[in-house]
Amino acid sequence: MNSNVENLPPHVIRQVYKEVSTLTPDPPEGIKIIPNEEDITDVQVSIEGPEGTPYAGGIFRMKLILGKDFPAAPPKGYFLTKIFHPNVSSNGEICVNVLKKDWKAELGIRHVLLTIKCLLIHPNPESALNEEAGRLLLENYEEYASRARLMTEIHAHSSSLRGKDPTDPCSSASVTGALGDGPMAKKHAGDRDKKLAAKKKTDKKRALRRL
């Protein structure tokens, strides 16, 4: 594991430890801190998808990596849960101004986490790392929202499935959640109905032969 603890001054380590220790029992609403006692510079959290967004109902894991120049330089943020979002790259990297040009050394971890949660409510297509998501957000919101909801259902919806693994391809909850009421769901339903009708016809013929 690449840890930056040994590269940070003792007073910075104490500052980070104090803030994480304060945040863990009292985090911002919809955010849970997952402390890493072995490496305080690797801050992992889970964020609830905000209501009224395509991410609602999802639980998204992410992490902040505090580099050797922290807090003079901003932490790097990564989503560990796959997400379809203009400001999140394919490898999970998060693009938000507070982690770049708007960073100030006095901004704490709480502020960063709240900013990232806000990004789920108000994506910024102007600084897109996922160009397709940014384009759809501007040109076809319904398609963007549909793609984002599908990714949420597949990768981030475990909390509402009552013990069933949503990533298990054999899970009926996974298939139902992923397909929803879209054309794929209708196609599968149509195929199933045809098979049932054919089976009924065969059974009827067999019954008539017996008479």
Curated annotation (Swiss-Prot):
Reaction it catalyzes: S-ubiquitinyl-[E1 ubiquitin-activating enzyme]-L-cysteine + [E2 ubiquitin-conjugating enzyme]-L-cysteine = [E1 ubiquitin-activating enzyme]-L-cysteine + S-ubiquitinyl-[E2 ubiquitin-conjugating enzyme]-L-cysteine
Compositional bias ranges of the Basic and acidic residues kind: 157-167
Region described as Disordered: 157-211
UBC core domain: residues covered: 11-157
GO annotation terms (biological process): anaphase-promoting complex-dependent catabolic process; cell division; exit from mitosis; free ubiquitin chain polymerization; positive regulation of ubiquitin protein ligase activity; protein K11-linked ubiquitination
Skewed-composition ranges (Basic residues): 197-211
Parts of the chain that traverse the membrane: none
GO MF, any single term: ATP binding
PROSITE patterns: UBC_1, UBC_2
Protein's job: Catalyzes the covalent attachment of ubiquitin to other proteins. Acts as an essential factor of the anaphase promoting complex/cyclosome (APC/C), a cell cycle-regulated ubiquitin ligase that controls progression through mitosis. Acts by specifically elongating 'Lys-11'-linked polyubiquitin chains initiated by the E2 enzyme ube2c/ubch10 on APC/C substrates, enhancing the degradation of APC/C substrates by the proteasome and promoting mitotic exit.
Protein name: Ubiquitin-conjugating enzyme E2 S
Organism: Aquarana catesbeiana
